[in-house]
Amino acid sequence: MYPAEDEMAFSQLFQKLYDLNYDIKMVVADDRPGIKPALNKVFPYAKLQLCHVHYLENIRTELRVRTEERYRHFFNSLRLHVFIEGTDEKKIDQGLEHVLRNHTAHSPKLQDIIWEIKRRREVLFNYLKIQDCPNNTNLIELYNSHLAGRLKTVKGFQSFFSAQKWLNAFLIRRRTKPFTDCEGKFKYLNKHSSLEFTIKKQAFWPDVLTKLGISKINFSEKSD
């Protein structure tokens, strides 16, 4: 738990992961200014991927797409041809040129959006460099909504330390509880806990988990 989402907080988080021998290849996040410098300090070889959902939402808000039709066609074309169909470098180039050529005439505002995407192209499409890497934070956002729902039943904590202990217990439970309702490409996760796919096979099994009655993990081939 950290009091603010700043470079210091991210640095401490990454350092703890480093101390646990957790090898980070990619960090998927929204556009927080402190993440990149913190990542470079601890995991200089790791890549940053900006969340497409957040990035597109910022453009949608800037252009008032939900309430005005003026830029709606531009936005839908951008989302389709660049962020959905842009599954490799060539398609990204083609998508950007298509939108620039057909939807930005005489509009410096729209042209600036395209040039900004080109300028930040690497952090927007780094996910293509790692197989099955997500390009959004939907999963963690869903996880956070579950946590927020659980916190509604808690009246309060006596101290920051007690809140930290409660959160640790919540995370342990969530990490060791088998999935039951996964569908589509995530269906294989059912009957497995998330810890099965991340913990190293040679890792020491914490006593606290044994005390909680969590003493067996059925490692799958996905954890190799």
Locations of regions flagged by a protein language model:
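Extended amphipathic alpha-helical interaction segments
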Residues: 19, 25-28, 34-159, 178, ...
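Active-site beta-loop-alpha junctions of metal-dependent nucleic acid enzymes
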Residues: 1-21, 26
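Short amphipathic alpha-helical segments
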Residues: 9, 31, 162-166
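Flexible, glycine- and charge-enriched loops at secondary-structure boundaries
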Residues: 3, 7, 49, 160
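Basic, amphipathic alpha-helical segments enriched in Lys/Arg and hydrophobic/aromatic residues
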Residues: 149-223
